[in-house]
């Protein structure tokens, strides 16, 4: 049970739910530019497993790392933090 606590978690916004039991989550990171030392926003997309097809576009969700479920899918939905308005 302790091993699950070591898994990575990310919070992001659902940008697509067109696939069956799969959502695409956009996660935003703030990284420091190596030369200019400015904080730059970096966005990357993750495919996550949504077992019950309960997410809608615009929802803010928490995803957790898991074993590979398909070619691109290595994350699963933990909870829906807030619903789209």
Swiss-Prot record:
The keyword Ribonucleoprotein applies. It comes from the Bacteria. GO terms for biological process: translation. InterPro entries: NA-bd_OB-fold, Ribosomal_uS17, Ribosomal_uS17_bact/chlr, Ribosomal_uS17_CS. One of its GO terms (cellular component) is cytosolic small ribosomal subunit. Part of the 30S ribosomal subunit. This is Small ribosomal subunit protein uS17. It comes from Lachnospira eligens (strain ATCC 27750 / DSM 3376 / VPI C15-48 / C15-B4).
């Amino acid at each position: 049970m302790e091993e699950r606590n070591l898994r990575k978690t990310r919070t992001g916004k659902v940008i697509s739910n067109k696939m069956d039991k799969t959502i695409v989550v956009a996660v935003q990171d703030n990284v420091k530019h190596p030369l200019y030392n400015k904080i730059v926003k970096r966005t990357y997309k993750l495919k996550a497993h949504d077992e019950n097809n309960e997410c809608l576009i615009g929802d803010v969700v928490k995803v957790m790392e898991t074993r590979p479920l398909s070619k691109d899918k290595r994350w699963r939905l933990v909870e829906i933090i807030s619903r789209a308005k």
